[in-house]
């Protein structure tokens, strides 16, 4: 068996990636989220495949086809709720994975980090298009509002929006193409994940100390396969509790009303995992400015390697920057809450303050804190 594992051209690749991979001996449970994201992706592709067998991407029948899946297809309700809540679990794991990367300075592996940002954009695009497919009120109005943001682009904006819509409003053509893209994107994401792993295995994993761990590596299997399996069990348990006991808790009640272009819902808002970005978008009165802030709220992650001023890699031994980090986490939770609130006092001013704080912490306060710590520890 050892010979096949190490000699066979295909199995050899799997062996070097998941079995004999030299891994730091001290990586914590925060390093579990990569494998959990892989599991989420597999769950989403499988449940999505079975949903696609029964779904029709036509404005006249899309809503009814989802109802048909839940009522008439064997375990259709389960597949539908696994897929809907699977997206939420996916984003929870994504945010924790990115948060771990920021905390432990993993962004210094620039290729892996940039690939991760591209993956984040791709997953967000996929989730947005998936939310449109049930063709409920929030699906329709969410699609209208978010795609309409592109009209803020000077000169080509209006033409671009109509090109994406396939007409003069969100209609049958839009739904059909969103379904096509929603179906193909997860497979593109899978390919990008392999590139992400390829870049990661060029440098090897980071670890909580941020120090070089070449002197103390252990094989991935059995140590981290077992550790990852514990993470898988915990995730599946949380996932099953969410799906079987509270399937609609993260959804919007408006989406149980069929799409109606003549009736606008009182509060148009995206799914919970986009609310922080939506709050940043809304906090700027100018349309183009809002769109730029929205894109920058994610793209700012790409600047992190260049904003790193500390001589230490991780935040493990840097209490000042640690404080900044946890303020940033609290700020993102505030933005998420604000994104779901109506546009009125005091939510507007809270959202604007939190948006300024978000960019200020990343661009100004964390780099300054790094320099102060260098000075205190006399690392200059």
Swiss-Prot record:
The UniProt entry lists the main location of this chain as mitochondrion
Q: Which domain of life is it from?
A: Eukaryota
Topology of the protein relative to the lipid bilayer: Multi-pass membrane protein
Q: Which InterPro entries match?
A: Cyt_b/b6_C (IPR005798), Cyt_b/b6_C_sf (IPR036150), Cyt_b/b6_N (IPR005797), Cytb/b6-like_sf (IPR027387), Cytochrome_b (IPR030689), Cytochrome_b_C_euk/bac (IPR048260), Cytochrome_b_N_euk/bac (IPR048259), Di-haem_cyt_TM (IPR016174)
What family classification does the UniProt entry report for this protein? Belongs to the cytochrome b family.
How is this protein named in the record? Cytochrome b
A Gene Ontology term for the protein's cellular component: respiratory chain complex III
Which proteins does it associate with, and in what oligomeric form? The cytochrome bc1 complex contains 11 subunits: 3 respiratory subunits (MT-CYB, CYC1 and UQCRFS1), 2 core proteins (UQCRC1 and UQCRC2) and 6 low-molecular weight proteins (UQCRH/QCR6, UQCRB/QCR7, UQCRQ/QCR8, UQCR10/QCR9, UQCR11/QCR10 and a cleavage product of UQCRFS1). This cytochrome bc1 complex then forms a dimer.
**Residues that bind heme b b562, according to the entry?**
83, 182
Q: Which residues form a coiled coil?
A: none
> What Pfam families does UniProt report for this protein, alphabetically?
Cytochrom_B_C (PF00032), Cytochrome_B (PF00033)
Segments traversing the membrane? 33-53, 77-98, 113-133, 178-198, 226-246, 288-308, 320-340, 347-367
Query: Corresponding gene?
Result: MT-CYB
Compartments (UniProt record): Mitochondrion inner membrane
Q: Which GO terms describe its biological process?
A: mitochondrial electron transport, ubiquinol to cytochrome c
Q: Which cofactor does it need?
A: heme b
Xref: CDD domains? cytochrome_b_C, Cytochrome_b_N
Single GO molecular function:
ubiquinol-cytochrome-c reductase activity
Species per Swiss-Prot/TrEMBL record:
Microtus mexicanus (Mexican vole)
Q: Which UniProt keywords apply?
A: Electron transport, Heme, Iron, Membrane, Metal-binding, Mitochondrion, Mitochondrion inner membrane, Respiratory chain, Transmembrane, Transmembrane helix, Transport, Ubiquinone
Any idea what job this protein has?
Answer: Component of the ubiquinol-cytochrome c reductase complex (complex III or cytochrome b-c1 complex) that is part of the mitochondrial respiratory chain. The b-c1 complex mediates electron transfer from ubiquinol to cytochrome c. Contributes to the generation of a proton gradient across the mitochondrial membrane that is then used for ATP synthesis.
Q: Where does heme b b566 bind?
A: 97, 196
**Cofactor notes:** Binds 2 heme b groups non-covalently.
Q: Where does a ubiquinone bind?
A: 201
Q: What more is known?
A: Heme 1 (or BL or b562) is low-potential and absorbs at about 562 nm, and heme 2 (or BH or b566) is high-potential and absorbs at about 566 nm.
């Amino acid at each position: 068996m050892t010979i096949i594992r190490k000699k066979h051209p295909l199995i050899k690749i799997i062996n070097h990636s998941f079995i004999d991979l030299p891994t730091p001996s001290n990586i914590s449970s925060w390093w579990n989220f990569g494998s959990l994201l892989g599991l989420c992706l597999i769950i989403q592709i499988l449940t999505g495949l079975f949903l696609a067998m029964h779904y029709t991407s036509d404005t006249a029948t899309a809503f009814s086809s989802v109802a048909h899946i839940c009522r008439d297809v064997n375990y259709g309700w389960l597949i539908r709720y696994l897929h809907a809540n699977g997206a939420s679990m996916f984003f929870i794991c994504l945010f924790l994975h990115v948060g771990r990367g920021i905390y432990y300075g993993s962004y210094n592996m620039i290729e892996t980090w940039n690939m991760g940002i591209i993956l984040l954009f791709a997953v967000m695009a996929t989730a947005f298009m998936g939310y449109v497919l049930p063709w409920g009120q929030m699906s329709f109005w969410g699609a209208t509002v978010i795609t309409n943001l592109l009209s803020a682009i000077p000169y080509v904006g209006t033409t671009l929006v109509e090109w994406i819509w396939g007409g003069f409003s969100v209609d049958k053509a839009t739904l059909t193409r969103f379904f096509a893209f929603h179906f193909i994107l997860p497979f593109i994401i899978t390919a990008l994940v392999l590139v992400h792993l390829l870049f990661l295995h060029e440098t090897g994993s980071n670890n909580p100390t941020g120090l070089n761990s070449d002197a103390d590596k252990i094989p991935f299997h059995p140590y981290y396969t077992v550790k990852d399996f514990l993470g898988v069990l915990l995730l599946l348990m949380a996932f099953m509790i969410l799906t079987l006991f509270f399937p609609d808790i993260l959804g919007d009640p408006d989406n149980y009303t069929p799409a109606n272009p003549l009736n606008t819902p009182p509060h148009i808002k995206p799914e919970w995992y986009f609310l922080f970005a939506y709050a940043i978008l809304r906090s700027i009165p100018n349309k183009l400015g809002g769109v730029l802030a929205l894109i920058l709220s994610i793209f700012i992650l790409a600047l992190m390697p260049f904003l790193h001023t500390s001589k230490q890699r991780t935040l493990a031994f840097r209490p000042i920057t640690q404080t900044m980090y946890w303020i940033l986490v609290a700020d993102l939770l505030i933005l998420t809450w604000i994104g779901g609130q109506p546009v009125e006092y005091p939510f507007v001013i809270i959202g604007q303050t939190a948006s300024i704080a978000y960019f200020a912490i990343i661009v100004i306060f964390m780099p300054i804190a790094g320099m102060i710590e260098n000075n205190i520890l006399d690392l200059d």
